[in-house]
Amino acid sequence: EPITTGLKTYPSVLNKKGTYTQSSQLTITESEVGSSKIYCEVRRGESVWIKEIPDCKGDKVHPTVILTQSSSEEITSRRFATVLCSIIDFHPESITVSWLKDGQHMESGFVTSPTCGVNGTFSATSRLTVPAREWFTNKVYTCQVSHQGVTQSRNITGSQVPCSCNDPVIKLLPPSIEQVLLEATVTLNCIVSNAPYGVNVSWTQEQKSLKSEIAVQPGEDADSVISTVNISTQAWLSGAEFYCVVNHQDLPTPLRASIHKEEVKDLREPSVSILLSPAEDVSAQRFLSLTCLVRGFSPREIFVKWTINDKSVNPGNYKNTEVMAENDNSSYFIYSLLSIAAEEWASGASYSCVVGHEAIPLKIINRTVNKSSGKPSFVNISLALLDTVNSCQ
């Protein structure tokens, strides 16, 4: 007898191979399931195809329950263990799945998803996630399945092998000196090494939560997490304390680390000079070097870069040494080497060594030299040039 209610047939769809696909959907009530056989009949011309629809309602069938777990190597590397409880071939659909740890019911950490099989029975999976540190404490985990008055339990024991999972380590990085001197906001970085799965990283300033961003595993190792927060430059310069807080269910208490701008009592302004190749070398070589010597400054935070005709030079085209202490250990120096083509020098281009340091009255100074200048000239960089340097980074 043809069915006329609860039926929805969708338009034919042209496939890439030039054939068509058509779908038909039948909706019935739960009470109608199993009351009679249902067939899908397809006619095309004189051809007829008939397919019986499987019935998900039938005799009572209790499930088969199987437990599997991830390997110890995977648990150590991913920082969590996965236990899969497979509940296979049961009928009717209604089941209850519970997880126990050492005989105590667990309230969270697992997800259960039932599905209907094509053979008229149901199957389901329940996935339990356990932090690695907890897994390696030899606890017993139980998947308990109740179906039609019958309860089945399957146990699995965590590894007795000690976990090689070290405690998380927090490393805080201050903003770059270039950010501090040139921008209205600066970025603080919190690097969490040995980060467990599901770690939460947040920032606070004197009990006030700050909006931050987190990136997973961009650090030096696969188990690191980096969280960044943007604050005003003024707040950083004020010496305020900023806290990175690491939370995880595996930690007895949250881990905290703080950072602030250190107060500098001995500010020393740097001297800047450019060292040129000897005149005879310039005429004899295709390339020549400009060396910028910056010395006598304190504290050690500084940036040095170059411009050609007031346009920033790509950092890959010059080389800065590490900041080094001078003989008295109370001040520092740094070299920057720029290689240029002799033809460019001969054309009259102007080369500037741009230096930023908090002891400089205008925060930035430069030395400029070109073929016709005779000797390097010292210039306090103007606000207009400051904007140019900043925009060309």
From Swiss-Prot:
| Entry superkingdom | Eukaryota
Q: Which CDD domains match?
A: IgC1, IgC1_CH3_IgAGD_CH4_IgAEM
Annotated glycan sites: N119, N155, N200, N230, N329, N366, N370, N380
Which residue numbers delimit the Ig-like domain? Answer: 63-157, 168-260, 270-370
Quote the Pfam families the UniProt record gives.
C1-set (PF07654)
Q: Which InterPro entries match?
A: Ig-like_dom, Ig-like_dom_sf, Ig-like_fold, Ig/MHC_CS, Ig_C1-set, Immune_Resp_Modulators
Instruction: Give a yes or no for keyword Signal in this entry.
Output: no
**In its UniProt entry, what is this protein called?**
Ig heavy chain C region
Source organism of the structure: Heterodontus francisci
Lineage start: Eukaryota, Metazoa, Chordata, Craniata, Vertebrata
